[in-house]
Amino acid sequence: MEEAGCRNIIFSSSATVYGDPKEIPITENCPKGICTNPYGWTKWMQEQMLIYLQKASPEWNVILLRYFNPIGAHHSRKIGEDPKGIPNNLLPYVAKVASGALEKVHVYGNDYDTKDCTGVIDYIHVV
């Protein structure tokens, strides 16, 4: 990136960097780096490397996005997880099976070239 003159990076991190939070809702001010699994630790370490890069070289622009897996619906029931057709996310899929709308949960793919045979994509390449 440096050789190409690209000093902007948006990092796809995770809310797992918060570990098991002591307060809800989680805010930017909550303690971080108290991870409970290796995935969270790797995201936290990558965040730290990018923060140090930006401190050492202020011409770098770093944005950290900490994704959550939101589940649920608004108390009015007017917005929430109720996909049309076959859902793409696990929880609405399980909810449709539990309600009888679908017969069973299907698991697709067991032949990915990873240790646990799941598809893992950590980086987004933009051309």
What name fits each language-model region?
Residues 3, 7-8, 17-69, 78-89:
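Catalytic helix-loop patch of NAD(P)-dependent Rossmann-fold dehydrogenases
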Residues 51-127:
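NAD(P)-dependent short-chain dehydrogenase/reductase
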Residues 13-14:
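Conserved NAD(P)H cofactor-binding loop of Rossmann-fold oxidoreductase domains
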